[in-house]
Curated annotation (Swiss-Prot):
Residues 54-105 form the bHLH domain. This is Spermatogenesis- and oogenesis-specific basic helix-loop-helix-containing protein 1. In males, it is mainly expressed in testis, while in females it is mainly expressed in ovary. In testis, it is exclusively expressed in spermatogonia, with a preference for prespermatogonia and type A spermatogonia. In ovary, it is detected in germ cell cysts, primordial follicles, and primary follicles but is undetectable by the secondary follicle stage (at protein level). Expressed in the majority of spermatogonia in adult animals, but not in the most undifferentiated spermatogonial population. Disruption phenotype: Knockout mice are infertile. Males lacking SOHLH1 display disrupted spermatogonial differentiation into spermatocytes and show a strong down-regulation Lhx8 and Neurog3/Ngn3 genes. Females display perturbed follicular formation, probably partially due to down-regulation of Nobox and Figla, 2 genes required for folliculogenesis. Fertility could be restored by conditional expression of a SOHLH1 transgene after the onset of meiosis. One of its GO terms (biological process) is positive regulation of DNA-templated transcription.
Length: 357
């Protein structure tokens, strides 16, 4: 009997499980599902309202409070200013009413403080001008005083050009004539040093005090005369102007500088080599790009020069003269005496056979 009752209970349990998992649930199950879904929807709505409620409520309350204050102010102003009766409470009308009220209050009560900026009196203005003038004169006097043997340029000397720069300006025409003469002069072989196109060591050192300001910093030689140069870039020109011989030498050296200054594209920049304090293209003659000149009595090139990295066929012929080069087309040489321009494409192919396929 006990075993039969246990089997009936198992069958009832299986029937109830099948009934609960069937596709058509009983009406009681549908009611319970609808009730649970409605309760969950009601629970999520208050949560969302609670999350957005404080910020929304605070904004609405603050906006209502602000509008209420504006309305009260407009009511008070309308009572004081009858011509604004019936106007709308927008910001323009509120500002206009406020300005009109302030003007009316100032006219009725003159003891109110005026809203205008007080102008300084004439005596105070003249006093300020005198103070500024005294400070400017004191700075000029302090600049003109010598400091440990070094003359500092004053404000007046900054306006006027130094004598050496004036001489450079006056000798511009002579420099151009000399440049044309150098262009017409026949060129010599690379074995001979060209004095017009290269600077020796004493010449570059003697040009130290008289270098014009447009010469790059890398051109200035590292000689003991560099201690006489003012830190701001100015030089002692008083002693040079007093000595006529030194001024004449300065004029000649200025002509030499103007006649032999190469193009800035080939002298300045990250790839320019420096030999003895001067740029590589400035210290060597135009045959630097033909190859090394150590075996011909010329100066040795820098180790980092572009000639070391060139092809052997490019350095090959040591007996090639610059006359043969100048017999070619005129585009090969520019006006800057040492900077080979871009030649024709066939010549470039013959010079660099590996770079141009």
């Amino acid at each position: 009997m006990a075993s039969g009752g246990h089997e009936r209970a198992n069958e009832d349990y299986r029937v109830s499980g099948i009934t609960g998992c069937s596709k058509t649930p009983q009406p009681e199950t549908q009611d319970s599902l609808q009730t649970s879904s409605q309760s969950s929807a009601l629970c999520t709505a208050p949560v969302a309202a609670a999350n957005l409620g404080p910020s929304l409520r605070r904004n609405v309350v603050s906006e209502r409070e602000r509008r209420r204050r504006i309305s009260l102010s407009c009511e008070h102003l309308r009572a004081l200013l009858p011509q604004f009766d019936g106007r709308r409470e927008d910001m323009a009308s509120v500002l206009e009413m406020s300005v009109y009220f302030l003007q009316l209050a100032h006219s009725m009560d003159p003891s109110w403080e005026q809203l205008s900026v007080p102008q300084p009196p004439q005596e105070m203005w003249h006093m300020w001008q005198g103070d500024v003038l005294q400070v400017t004169l004191a700075n000029q006097i302090a600049d003109s005083k010598p400091d440990s043997g070094i003359a500092k340029p004053s404000a007046v000397s900054r306006v006027q050009d130094p004598p050496c720069f004036g001489m450079l300006d006056t000798d511009q025409s002579q420099a151009t004539e000399r440049e044309s003469e150098l262009l017409e002069r026949p060129s010599s072989c690379p074995g001979h040093r060209q004095s017009a196109l290269s600077f020796s060591e004493p010449e570059s050192s003697s040009l130290g005090p008289g270098l014009p300001p447009w010469i790059p910093h890398s051109w200035q030689p590292a000689t003991p005369e560099a201690s006489d140069i003012v830190p701001g870039g100015s030089h002692q020109v008083a002693s040079l102007a007093g000595d006529p011989e030194s001024s004449g030498m300065l004029a000649e050296e200025a002509n030499l500088v103007l006649a032999s200054v190469p193009d800035a594209r080939y002298t300045t920049g990250a790839g320019s080599d420096v030999v003895d304090g001067a740029p590589f293209l400035m210290t060597t003659n135009p045959d630097w790009w033909l190859g090394s000149v150590e075996g011909r009595g010329g100066p040795a090139l820098a180790r980092s020069s572009p000639v070391d990295g060139a092809e052997p066929s490019f350095i090959g012929d040591p007996e090639l003269c610059s006359q043969e080069l100048q017999a070619g087309p005129g585009e090969l040489w520019g006006l800057d005496f040492g900077s080979p321009g871009l030649a024709l494409k066939d010549e470039a192919d013959s010079i660099f056979p590996d770079f141009f396929p």
